[in-house]
Amino acid sequence: MKKQLKFWLVFIGIGSILSCEKEQQKTLDLSQANIVISAQIKSPIQETAASILVEEIKKRTNLQLGWNNNWDSKTTIALALANEKELFGTKVPARDGENTPESKKEGYRIFHQKDGDKNTLWVIAADKRGILYGIGKLLRTAKMENSKITLNPNIDFSESPEYALRGHQFGYRNTANSWDAWTVEQFDQHFREQVLFGANSFENIPFQEADSSPHFKIDPQIMEVELSKICEKYDADYWVWTPAPHDLTIKNAHQDGLAEQEAFYAKCPRLDGVFVPGGDPGENHPSKLMPYLKDLSEILHKYHPNAGIWVSLQGFNKEKVEYFFNYLNSESPDWLKGVVYGPSSPPIELEREMLPKKYLHRFYPDITHTVRCHYPVDNWDQAYALTLGREPINPQPLMYTQLFNRDTKYTDGFITYSDGSHDDLNKVLWSQLGWDSKKNPKDILHEYTQFFFGPKVAEKAAQGIFDLEKNWDGPILENESIKETLSLWKSLEDNNPDLANNWRWQQLIMRAYYDAYIQDRLAYEKRLEAEAYEILDQANALGADKAMSDALEHINKADTELVSQDLKEKVFEYGEKLFQSIGAQTSVDKYQARSAERGAILDFIDYPLNNRWWLEDEFKKIGEYTSEAEKLARLEFIRNYESPGEGSFYDNISSADARHVTSKTDDAIDFLWENNGLSRKRLSTQLFQFTPTLEYRDLDPDSDYLIRVSGYGEALLRANGERLKPAKYEKGFEEFKEFPLTKALIKDGHLKISFDKPDEEHLNWRKQSRVTDVWLIKQQ
């Protein structure tokens, strides 16, 4: 019996030891690691790599890792180049074959090697950039907590980038909604973080006046050189966006432009790309622009021999496009590095097809705006467009993953257009998709939240970002997830006070509160408007003037009996925090934002979400009528504006809740912008399309209908392909065109409405014809 007991005790003991060893293998503890860096990694990247590892780990763990080029420590983080055989006497792990990621440009491999009781985490790269990207992957995947940094053991991960060019624009100018307030140190940290997520290029917009922004901490003429130095520190390409003189036909414009550029080139320690937009701004013909660029290239190469000249075809008409490509085909200039695809360029796939193979094709996608832009938010509720506007905090991982894969394939890479820190998540997403377009955005977001917020909240915060994007999907009043999103972020906010000063954290929480406040306001104000119309329904009994007075008093409760002020106060609280942390300018008056469209989301947080401003103006007009009958008739029309009766239908074009509209615009200029964002027009009039399409089913085939259209200018309407003649044709805003529709055209109860585009190419789009409202009214 004693022998049996002794056997089981020994067995249990051995099992415990094995279990402990197994437990220990679950993580690779780097808390006491020493850093070893190859001498082949030249300065400044050797110092940069060491400082990144030491500083970023210390920020998150309070651990101070050592940098000693020896193997005395039991745990080592070793940085080496793939072509090296040994690192301070230790063999560098190598794989067979020439097609490994770590042998390709910018590629790297992270590999855990265990030798007895010693652990080495290798970062092996093809070049010095690859070293930084390998460090980035290490820091993004490591779990860093107080006094501890761990990684999954036996890691063997490698990758090289799919796209050679992966960058973002950071124009140090007043137009930016935040970083015109940044110091050199803030730019250094931010560029570092972008590099750690895979970026390799940064584009500035030089030649700014010192007094052009009230937020400048440093003269822009100095900052444009400092940004060049930062790029050199991180081995990132430094690009500049520098338009040509507006009109090169003006005397001395050509030479003056060259002289200004030369002075800038001479003082930059690093410069890799010069992007000269063909238009936007400027309207130079390529016959004038190309000689200017040729001369510019000679000056550029005098100071930066390997830098390239790039040009876009923005705003080019057909003749200019043909001239440009004929020039490339006939002259084949070696001084031109490539063409940039930007807004109002020819279609991206056509531009790639026409571009000779010797030239690179760069994408210039707008990831910073939500309306009146390159990539509008799909199915966005008007209430958001009126309040959050064009530059809100806009993490949209799912939308941008789809758009990246749709468009970037025609190019050799990208430098995104950005004008603020509000699109930070989008930048990281694009950088990572530039490495691998098949990456799951869920994995990208998890690395983002783990690196910036820590492993404990990473999963929930990543979900919270997806939820913020979901908040913007479709009609607000039908979106049940908005309050759930707020609940998640409130919980994260309450339980993680240590993140209170983290600007990325502040942005996301602010959006959650803002969205919820808009939802509450919209529900409240829509109810007030519906109740105001019920008062107008009593106009025959009350009298027109009394009914208007009572209705206006009721609908204006939106301004006197406020809702959800606790949510609004939190939004303003975070507006102040963001101004203090990163200089975010969320208000023109309060924080000196450049303009109302430039991120000033606080200034529009209480913009009317019902038609009270419009009703006030309409009631003033009606008050001038001399006939009570006229007043009552107009009030009846207003009351039933969106309710044409049983068997009839109304659609506000481009509204998220329009049921019959089948068309979408591709640039979101369907949200009107006038009077600096404070339009008093009817809300439906502020949404439009130029040539919408609508579709109806199950109409009464035995009934005639009337199609009523509101908008501006022409309306060349077709019903099931047949052009209809109008019985009424008014062209002003909130006036009407009416088209009789006979039952002969809808024998099967199916109707498609379309609009031919009038010949208005000579007009600015703001003056072109558009459709705002469409009624299909059943005739009795």
Where are these regions (language model features)?
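Bacterial N-terminal signal peptides that target proteins for export
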Residues: 1-8
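Feature activates predominantly on carbohydrate-active enzymes
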Residues: 28, 43-44, 49-52, 56-58, ...
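Structural motif
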Residues: 37-43, 79-85, 124-126, 172, ...
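Catalytic-core regions of glycoside hydrolase
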Residues: 143-147, 200, 212-228, 232-233, ...
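C-terminal non-catalytic alpha-helical accessory regions
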Residues: 418-426, 438-637
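Glycan-recognition and processing domains
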Residues: 613, 617-700, 764-780
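Beta-strand-rich ligand-recognition modules
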Residues: 683-702, 710-779
